[in-house]
Amino acid sequence: MPYVPLEWLRQYVQVRPGTDAAALAADLVKVGLEEEQIVPARVTGPLVVGKVLTQEPKEQSNGKVINYCRVDVGEQHNDAPGTGKEPSELPSRGIICGAHNFKPGDSVVVSLPGAVLPGDFKIAARKTYGHISDGMICSAAELGFPDDGKHGIIVLDERYPEGEVPAPGTDALALLGLDDEVVEINVTPDRGYCFSMRGVAREYSHSTGGAYQDPADTTNADFYPQGLQAPGNDGPRVEVNDEAPINGVPGCDRYVARLVEGVNPNAPTPDWMSRRLQASGMRSISLAVDVTNYVMLELGQPLHAFDADKLTLPLVVRRAQAGEKLTTLDDVERVLDPQDLVIADGEGGSRVLAIAGVMGGATSEVSETTTNVLIEAAHFHPVSVARSARRHKLPTESSKRFERGVDYQLAPVAAQRAADLLVRYGGGSYGPITEIDRTQAPAPIEFALDAASRLTGVDYPREQVVGLLREIGCQVNDDGGATVQVSAPSWRPDLTGSAELVEEIARLDGYDNIPVQLPVAPAGTGLTFAQRARRDIVRTVAEQGLTQVLSYPFVGDIYDRLELPADDERRQAVRIANPLADDAPLLRTSVLDSLIDVAVRNVSRGIGDVALYEVGNVTTSAGVVPAPIPGVAQRPSQAEIEALAAGTPRQRLHLGAILCGQHGYSGVLQHVRNWDWADAVELVRDIASLLGLKLHVANAERAPWHPGRCAEIRIVVPTKNPTRPQIGEVIGYAGELHPRIVKKLGLPERACAVELDLDALIECSSKQPVVKAQPVSTYPAAKEDFAFVVDEATPSQEVAAAIIIAGGKLLDDVRLFDVYRGPQLGPGRKSLAFSVRLRASDHTLSASETEAARARIIKQVGKYTGAKLRA
């Protein structure tokens, strides 16, 4: 992300006094430029100007000659005469130096003990070559500057006119620009213009109101001493021929080629430019390359420098041909794609020189012998550059800017700026210019003046709206109507509609000015009945000692392992078009499909006592006919929407549970038993009781349960005749899993499972009449015991139901307390013993009433179940 040196920023915008890096970051945040980090100064500690007083060459045993110097570092840093680590008659410090490009009387840069130089090089007084060096005389490289070719220390007398050299003790950090902190900012994709000092300075001006000076203003003689020179007919030949534009948009609509001749290849990059490049995260390479990088950082226009003597004109901008190759500046040979936009030379563009907007090639790069430089400044289409950069995995500073959008009017200005710098610092001369301009200004935006107020809730006066739009560079044609015509500035390709203009108005006025008002929820009744019921169910199951889990609803071919019949509707699972895992491409039709795998995983890891439950959706496609998917060209009709809804697989909320191993924990005072089928059924009864429902439980055969220990769960639906309730549809199963399946899965013996349709349970519960509390009878109860002999296949529930019907209002309670099988009953017969309690609400039952009720019970049970009273 871009680095913003405060010293550089001051050149283009008036910065408030006392502003440091933290304050700069805070000001930029106000206009939407977030702070990534604050980069501290490269050098810390005392770095001062020193004047060499004496220089004593001392030859060492290894033949090396070093200099022992006494250096005046200012009154506040000097050792007084006769004091210090090595006393001297001169107020100074003793310093050892191995360089020889200075003499007594020269002013140099001295780092004193306590300073930290780049590379975490800490300066301290140390004994070396027989003397104590109480500091260090610094070279450019030691301070992090590029090599100036002299390989020696910095002599300030060579940089300042006579009489203007700073006095000893002067702070050299500020003198050399080493104390400047840098702010790294985060730029969103729509704000590509902020990848330049020009853009950041403009945003800082918006934030603080500081006076802004556009570095792209060619009428400013300080930046452009020659103004903007016009192209002529004698410029380099250029052809732009994009025969395969992406999405119909040409890859290049503006191309400027500009020659600068006679550049001194040994001319150094000026210190101020090197410092700014380094502060911005770039290394100094050569004057020509540094100038192109500097102008890119300053204006936001990527440039490329070709060695003009290595080119064969014309330059051709075209699409690459299949199989073409290019060795880029990073020494990687790249195979080009026909969608790559390239710069080539020669007739017909026979030789590829660069990938447009991404990186140049090695064959035409600027070298240490280059004297004639051709500067390329172009406007490339963002999509074309972005695809090439991603295709070749080659993100560059250039591509980052082009793919976010570059000012389409900036190419000739940036080329002029680069030429001026090369002429000034490289001793070159202005050469001819060629420009191809096919750019088109975007159409004006019709903008409603009240749009910003409507969307933000802030009352923006007409004058403020127009003023803010003009402040960001828009041309506003205001004829006094409700709307205005707005033309976005060339550096803002992101301003394409009314919404973007509203965002700019809110941003410049300040997001803090938008009132923060949380919406107030309308008064209601809180949770719905279904929501409360689901919460109560989850709590009730957890209170029974079960642990809730959440598993993925995606399963594989588990149905054979669970031994489901071939025609079982649970096999009609929905197949996912793009599954997360190839071995789980189906949506579960039962919670047990995925919950069993969770239990198996726990058991395989040594957890033998498992009591898990899950509440989740199951999906079934049984009876669903998929509808054709309508196109996107127009809104689907109501009939198509209804067909899609009808063709969508149904989802129901189910509860599943797995119970195996010990029920609870064993201890000295506690005997622990294993979970069994009765626990599974009782869990279902607890849920039904919570919802105020009565259940009809009957034996059933359903995989994967044990055929003799599987309970089919139905809801008893009340009718107008309370003694004749209706038995509803099946809403679940509970019981022991089939021993063969348990063994196959590796679960403990007699593992149990539950599966309930919670949606059906909750729906039935919501329809139940409100239960009215009945007063507790204070009259005594009459107790009667019955032992009925029935067929082995007759469930006890049917006998109990007949007792309830016969007992009517007098029935207070009925319980099964014994089941007996014996030879005296005969084969296929069993005895069910019930304890019945009878009670009237308003009187004590007489013997005759009790006897009559007993007779009715015996008759009713015999009628509906064929039972005989056991003798």
Residue ranges of predicted features:
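Mobile "lid/hinge" segments at catalytic clefts and subdomain interfaces of large enzymes
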Residues: I132-V155, R159-Y160, A172-L173, G177, ...
